[in-house]
């Protein structure tokens, strides 16, 4: 999760009226989102999941007050309807994980993260995920329909394919904001389907109807499997500025019960920091031996 995207998340959560609650980041890395939470969100309880053992242990050291599980998301057992907010950059790939609660849907990893997180968030709570454009642009609408039946699309922002170049990736990505419905509904909203723009490029209907939420220019480019659509950056524009403008266009309000933040007893998997090390700071350390 890049720092720019983290700032967008925080800004939009503030715009939606979120102050404090239970926050989940299910693929957290070292936890960029947790760093520098605004003062009005600092009372939130933080929960994270990270598969990589070294990265996960680092996150536990940096955020000793957070509940961070170092394991696959499919191996976690958070209760349903528990989190007020879920954020993160979901893994993407043409592979699947075993989770008996979702195996019947045959989800790929990125779709699985959406489905499981929807169940873990309270009705009225918000999910904000970065995902490959495949989530919104894939030809088969079944996963989008699954999501739409359970959540309301508040908005989406399409990022140019160089947005995460510092992480060594060149892929068109979307930031998607969803609000969990109170109940399952049968719906056929526009964003479930694809359409074509004036240049004949196929993409999600949401972006056809909201071209200002595409922070670049959609073009056909050469990909690993032939020609494919991509959002290419436009010269002379600041992505950070365009992100700030785009997020202001997303409307909605988080609506959750004003209950106390959970203090449920969870197994403490954190690593004690050495004396004198401040929270949300870095230090040199010797990591424990990790047997794979």
Model feature map: region roles:
Residues 31, 253-285, 291-292:
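Charged, often flexible domain-edge or linker segments that flank or initiate folded functional domains
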Residues 10-16, 22-37, 71-101, 111, ...:
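Conserved proline-anchored active-site loop of SAM-dependent methyltransferases
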Residues 60-76:
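S-adenosyl-L-methionine
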Residues 1-5, 9, 284, 289-292:
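Single conserved hydrophobic/aromatic residue that forms the stacking wall/gate
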Residues 9, 106-162, 177:
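Conserved Class I SAM-dependent methyltransferase catalytic core
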Residues 3-62:
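Class I S-adenosyl-L-methionine
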Residues 165-259:
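Flexible, glycine-/basic-rich loop-and-beta segments that form/coincide
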């Amino acid at each position: 999760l890049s720092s720019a995207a983290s700032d967008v998340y925080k800004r939009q959560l503030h715009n939606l009226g979120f102050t404090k609650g239970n926050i989940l980041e299910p693929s957290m890395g070292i936890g960029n989102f947790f760093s520098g939470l605004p003062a009005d969100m600092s009372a939130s309880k933080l929960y994270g999941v990270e598969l990589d053992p070294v990265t996960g242990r680092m996150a536990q050291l940096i955020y000793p007050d957070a509940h961070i599980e170092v394991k696959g998301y499919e191996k976690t057992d958070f209760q349903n309807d528990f989190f007020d907010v879920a954020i993160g950059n979901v893994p993407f790939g043409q592979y699947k994980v075993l989770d008996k609660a979702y195996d019947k849907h045959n989800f790929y990893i990125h779709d699985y993260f959406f489905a499981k997180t929807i169940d873990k968030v309270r009705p009225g709570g918000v999910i904000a995920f970065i995902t490959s454009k495949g989530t919104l642009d894939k030809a088969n609408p079944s996963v989008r329909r699954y999501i739409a039946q359970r959540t309301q699309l508040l908005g989406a922002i399409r990022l140019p394919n160089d947005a995460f170049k510092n992480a060594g990736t060149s892929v068109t990505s979307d930031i998607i904001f969803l609000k969990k419905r109170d109940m399952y509904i049968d719906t056929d909203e526009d964003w479930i389907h694809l359409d074509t723009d004036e240049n004949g490029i196929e993409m999600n209907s949401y972006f056809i109807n909201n071209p200002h939420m595409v922070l670049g220019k959609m073009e056909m480019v050469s990909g690993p499997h032939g020609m494919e659509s991509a959002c290419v950056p436009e010269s002379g524009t600041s992505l950070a500025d365009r992100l700030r403008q785009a997020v202001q266009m997303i409307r909605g309000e988080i609506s959750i019960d004003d209950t106390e933040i959970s203090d449920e007893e969870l197994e403490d998997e954190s690593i004690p920091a050495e004396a004198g090390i401040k929270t949300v700071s870095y230090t040199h350390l010797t990591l424990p031996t990790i047997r794979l």
